[in-house]
Amino acid sequence: FESGCHASVCSGGGNMVFYCGPKGGAKSSTHDNRYELMLYRSPTGAQGWTRSQLLYDLAAGYPDMTLLGDRRLAIVFEAGPEKGFITRSSRPAGWMRLDVLILPREVADYGYWFE
């Protein structure tokens, strides 16, 4: 997991736990290392993370998750159109936006994953 950036943890019911945050990578001279938003799943109460899925491959940060009333997993996060967020103080319009992903309720089923 990328250290130093806010991430989110959410119960999927029973022992199912989800963790969502940027995988991160190398910084550049113009962009930070917050990119590749990942979802990790643990069916053992966060004792081990058995599944992972790339949700968004560009700039991503500050995700928050919740389990909706119909058991779908909702994730809201900051997103950008490049590999990492722009680090300079003067940023162009549209450099960042909020995105929402709604994942199917099956994501919390022990036998299901994205494959």
Predicted regions and their residues:
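Asp-box/BNR beta-propeller blade signature and adjacent active/binding-site loops
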Residues: F1-E115
